[in-house]
């Protein structure tokens, strides 16, 4: 929701680059939030310093290697003040509760350095898988247009389960033009159904997924069609 509001503002003002103040502590909190949600390797890897939010906006995070306390010190010394978000103290938010849990974790030796090392190791493994995922996209996917992709069913017999999962997550995100891919569980369920011979048609993550002979067609779901589908439900 927050990114959606900010990105809409940027698009209305023709702003092409959004710089955020995400720091090392944010990375750690993000790691634990996704760990609690049962995220896979991609979710547990570190935040990206540069990401493409959509076709018109890029997000840049230059402070990922800085501690929050250092950024606060710099801000207070140069600008004499900083904006404090009251929600950062509200324990109804998981992120706030995780900050409190971390104090106990540090007593057991799970300090910032060790957590960051773990995140970096996971990120390195994720980059390796992304290399093979990109090769799979080049081999098995053909983009008919910006919002339409044809996939060869041979991917199910020629690639590993993790590569297939990352492949479909990326394709769905690319075709729909959305920043976040669908939830892992939904992508896994889609792959399971696609492997069955009785798959006909489905929608997921703003995309329509259907079979065409020995191929899978993924196309962007038009807004009017999406509204009609919701009304039918």
For the regions a language model picked out, list residue spans one by one:
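ATP-dependent adenylate-handling ligase core
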Residues: 1-7, 41
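Hydrophobic (often cysteine-bearing) scaffold residues that line and stabilize catalytic clefts
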Residues: 2, 24, 94, 160, ...
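Structural element of the ATP-grasp superfamily
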Residues: 6, 71-75, 168
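Short, charged, solvent-exposed linker or helix-capping segments at domain edges/interfaces
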Residues: 7, 113, 228-232
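Catalytic subdomain that performs nucleotidyl-dependent activation
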Residues: 12-21, 29-118, 152
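Residue-level detector of well-ordered alpha-helical segments, enriched
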Residues: 27, 114, 163-167
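AMP-forming adenylation/ATP pyrophosphatase catalytic core
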Residues: 51-56, 100, 108, 119-233
